[in-house]
């Protein structure tokens, strides 16, 4: 599925330690956001002074002033060793769906709310980022989902998701009917507001709000979470990450249905369509500061209790 680019990387400047893992760095952020722009300007200046080649996503480049090398996300993925995303998890998800097809590390500076995927603080990123650039970091691979919509056996639409693919009606509080198959084995029929198919990464997002379990990031699994099911005994279920999930929409449904990928990309669904959700071949390569602790992140973001003794 990946797009191949034959783009040679420019040589690193002599002021950079040649043992470093990173030479060309991409900056990505939320457009027209004052806090994000401020952090991006600081990052650009800080990295440029140290001799790194810095590429800036074109959507935010015009807000950073002159002498900026503006490129699109695809070129950042093709040319950069590291991409720094400034914003919230939503900005990280949008960038990740593109960057996952390239061998580029991704780290985040949190300018959002919870920030499960954005490790660095916006007001004091320099110390932690300097250590990362010196090679002191942990790498974590997060797999993506691929969602496909078939109509009369023909592929009509597809996209990828980092967090989840959600089958739902276009109308609020509108129940739909569908069947669910796991690896072509019938599991159940469902009358509900929809179905969430989530990765471990997405298990702390929409799936958690709908009553799903939290899956640790290294778990090779998917979780299916029904949204307000009409059958109260229908609970979330965890399946192997290599499973193929098929949802068949009843012909009796209305026409205003869709599959949402991370809440950003929407695929139109008609009655009788089949939705296939499976693990994608693409992976997001997340970079964390050395000593990153997932359970510390959960405690701080979800307000869990600290140690008693």
Curated annotation (Swiss-Prot):
Gene Ontology biological process: NAD metabolic process; NADP biosynthetic process
Localization (cell): Cytoplasm
Active site residues according to the UniProt entry: 89
Catalytic activity: NAD(+) + ATP = ADP + NADP(+) + H(+)
SS bonds (residue pairs): none
InterPro entries (alphabetical): ATP-NAD_kinase_N, ATP-NAD_kinase_PpnK-typ_C, NAD/diacylglycerol_kinase_sf, NADK
A GO molecular function held by the record: metal ion binding
GO CC annotations on file: cytoplasm
One Pfam family of this chain: NAD_kinase_C
Membership in a protein family: Belongs to the NAD kinase family.
Protein's job: Involved in the regulation of the intracellular balance of NAD and NADP, and is a key enzyme in the biosynthesis of NADP. Catalyzes specifically the phosphorylation on 2'-hydroxyl of the adenosine moiety of NAD to yield NADP.
Name of the protein this chain belongs to: NAD kinase
